Amino acid sequence: MKGSCETTMVKSLLLLMLGFAIISSGAARRNPKVGLSALQKAGNCPPLEDNSVRVDIRIFNQNQGISVPRDFQNRSSSPWDYNITRDPDRFPSEIAEAQCRHSGCINAQGQEDGSMNSVPIQQEILVLRREPQGCSNSFRLEKMLIKVGCTCVTPIVHHAA
């Protein structure tokens, strides 16, 4: 399970970097008329616009990921577990999301301390979403907010006037 989560996280991070590279570089090759399928010619698929690019979604050098200690989510004062979300109309189709194990934080004795709060750390990522018209090779770039870990914070206290 850990290997699957790490692979999914690496894929998510690589896709995020790919999206930033496409957006930030003006050198993205544009092919507005290449690869029109019969569905697109019939008008059922969205037309390729000037802001369209062709992307090879195969991930190269998958085994050259950054080496990270495997148990950091267990050693944290705000530990978490990963849940895999699956969506066949999204690339990557599997994304690992963190879920905090406790509402409080873990103290030095290993006990939950309710005077502190365990909260998720969120990261915005870019994913490719398949267009709903049944165009198998038509995707749009979409932002997603995912939980990547948890951290321990002081609670927000509201004082009654």
UniProtKB/Swiss-Prot annotation:
Q: In its UniProt record, which GO terms are filed under biological process?
A: adaptive immune response; cartilage development; defense response to Gram-negative bacterium; defense response to Gram-positive bacterium; inflammatory response; innate immune response; interleukin-17-mediated signaling pathway; negative regulation of angiogenesis
Entry keyword set? Adaptive immunity, Cytokine, Disulfide bond, Glycoprotein, Immunity, Inflammatory response, Innate immunity, Secreted, Signal
Tell me the first and last residues of the signal peptide. Answer: 1-28
Glycoprotein as UniProt keyword = yes
Keyword Secreted, does the record have it? yes
Intracellular or extracellular location(s): Secreted
Between which residues do disulfide bridges form? 100-150, 105-152
InterPro entries per record:
Cystine-knot_cytokine (IPR029034), IL-17_chr (IPR020440), IL-17_fam (IPR010345)
GO CC annotation terms, alphabetical: extracellular space
List all annotated glycosylation positions: 83
- UniProt main location, coarse: secreted
UniProt subunit comment? Homodimer; disulfide-linked. Heterodimer with IL17A (IL17A-IL17F). Forms complexes with IL17RA and IL17RC receptors with 2:1 binding stoichiometry: two receptor chains for one interleukin molecule. IL17F homodimer forms predominantly complexes with IL17RC homodimer, whereas IL17A-IL17F favors complexes with IL17RA-IL17RC. IL17RA and IL17RC chains cannot distinguish between IL17A and IL17F molecules, potentially enabling the formation of topologically distinct complexes.
Family named by the database record = Belongs to the IL-17 family.
Role description: Effector cytokine of innate and adaptive immune system involved in antimicrobial host defense and maintenance of tissue integrity. IL17A-IL17F signals via IL17RA-IL17RC heterodimeric receptor complex, triggering homotypic interaction of IL17RA and IL17RC chains with TRAF3IP2 adapter through SEFIR domains. This leads to downstream TRAF6-mediated activation of NF-kappa-B and MAPkinase pathways ultimately resulting in transcriptional activation of cytokines, chemokines, antimicrobial peptides and matrix metalloproteinases, with potential strong immune inflammation.
State the protein's name. Interleukin-17F
Q: Which organism is it from?
A: Rattus norvegicus
